[in-house]
């Protein structure tokens, strides 16, 4: 499985997930209104949202772009 780790105006950075990590995730962390910090990567299980986080998990290559 290949997941996106960064998505910038210059393109995307990906990583091949290690054995046992068969999900890609994308987490939006709301810092202040109108500003979110986005984290992407591989995971074994879908992370649990904390505070005002929103999380999307998926199982296909680069699905967390």
From Swiss-Prot:
Query: Which Gene3D superfamilies has this protein been placed in?
Result: CD59
User: Which compartments is it annotated to reside in?
Assistant: Secreted
User: Which Gene Ontology cellular component terms are annotated?
Assistant: extracellular region
Query: Which Pfam family would be a valid example here?
Result: Toxin_cobra-type
Query: Molecular function terms in GO for this entry?
Result: toxin activity
Which cysteines form disulfides? 3-24, 17-42, 46-57, 58-63
CDD domains recorded:
TFP_snake_toxin
- Alphabetized InterPro entries for the sequence: Cytotoxin_Cobra (IPR003572), Snake_3FTx (IPR003571), Snake_toxin-like_sf (IPR045860), Snake_toxin_con_site (IPR018354), Toxin_cobra-type (IPR054131)
Q: Which UniProt keywords apply?
A: Disulfide bond, G-protein coupled acetylcholine receptor impairing toxin, G-protein coupled receptor impairing toxin, Neurotoxin, Postsynaptic neurotoxin, Secreted, Toxin
Q: Which tissues is this protein detected in according to the database? A: Expressed by the venom gland.
Further remarks about this protein from its record: Negative results: does not show interaction with adrenergic receptors (ADRA2B, ADRB1, ADRB2), dopaminergic receptors (DRD1, DRD2, DRD3, DRD4, DRD5), histaminic receptors (HRH1, HRH3, HRH4), muscarinic receptors (CHRM1, CHRM2, CHRM3, CHRM5), and serotoninergic receptors (HTR1A, HTR2A, HTR2B, HTR2C, HTR5A, HTR6, HTR7).
Task: Explain the purpose of this protein.
Answer: Potent antagonist (IC(50)=1-10 nM) of M4 (CHRM4) muscarinic receptors, and CHRM1, ADRA1A, ADRA2A and ADRA2C adrenergic receptors. Also antagonises ADRA1B and ADRA1D adrenergic receptors with a 10-times lower affinity.
Can you tell me which family this protein belongs to? Belongs to the three-finger toxin family. Short-chain subfamily. Aminergic toxin sub-subfamily.
Q: What is this protein called?
A: Muscarinic toxin 3
Q: Which organism is it from?
A: Dendroaspis angusticeps (Eastern green mamba)
């Amino acid at each position: 499985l290949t997941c996106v780790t960064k998505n910038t105006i210059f393109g995307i950075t990906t990583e091949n997930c290690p054995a046992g990590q068969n999900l890609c995730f994308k987490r939006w962390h709301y810092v202040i209104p109108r500003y979110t910090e986005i984290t992407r990567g591989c995971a074994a299980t879908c992370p649990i949202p904390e505070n005002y986080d929103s999380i999307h998990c998926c199982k296909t290559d680069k699905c967390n772009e």
